[in-house]
Amino acid sequence: MNDRMVWIDCEMTGLSLADDALIEVAALVTDSELNVLGEGVDIVIRPPDAALETMPEVVRQMHTASGLLDELAGGTTLADAEEQVLAYVREHVKEPGKAPLCGNSVGTDRGFLARDMRELEGYLHYRIVDVSSVKELARRWYPRAYFNSPAKNGNHRALADIRDSITELRYYREAVFVPQPGPDSERAKEIAARLSAPAAP
């Protein structure tokens, strides 16, 4: 089994789809074992001046500290960024609509992709693999694993944040998930039957 997974992270001037702009997009493709395929892409996008003027101060400070703000003047267009990301994704994912979007809290990223990079967003499966969901469950069910998870080093730069997300999922797979190959078929059927049985009156 070698199902592809498309990891995308975006940096924006804020979280509002009505007012804010994409300023960086990065992508890595992995196989089902979380091995990275190729070099990936990381592209800085020059936003409209209006989006820069209305950027919240906390976001401005974050992008200043990461160095991203200084790179925006030399950034490319949305169309060019989408073309570069799609070229990389298509190199490793041959069929559209097959590979899920993966990352941390990727619902927000998907919203901006659907607004600004429709062809790229449409190339992905409608399902997502959100590492933050795994993390939230681990916090509730396996707190020791949650509190000892790897430190993040991405510093709010898109490609580094993706690498952090992949590392996180590798960690939770080893620390929390049932070891491969998992339960045999009989045990799996037994669990399913027990959990789906009607509750006693």
Curated annotation (Swiss-Prot):
Gene3D superfamilies referenced in this protein's UniProt entry, alphabetically: Ribonuclease H-like superfamily/Ribonuclease H
Domain Exonuclease: 5-169
UniProt keywords, alphabetically: Cytoplasm, Exonuclease, Hydrolase, Nuclease
KW Transport (keyword) present: no
MF GO annotations: 3'-5'-RNA exonuclease activity; nucleic acid binding
SMART domains on file: EXOIII
UniProt-listed InterPro entries: Exonuclease_RNaseT/DNA_pol3 (IPR013520), Oligoribonuclease (IPR022894), RNaseH-like_sf (IPR012337), RNaseH_sf (IPR036397)
EC assignment: 3.1.15.-
Pfam family, one: RNase_T
Predominant location category: cytoplasm
SUPFAM superfamilies: Ribonuclease H-like (SSF53098)
Location(s) in or outside the cell: Cytoplasm
Gene Ontology CC annotation, any one: cytoplasm
Family membership: Belongs to the oligoribonuclease family.
Protein name per Swiss-Prot or TrEMBL: Oligoribonuclease
Organism expressing this protein natively: Streptomyces griseus
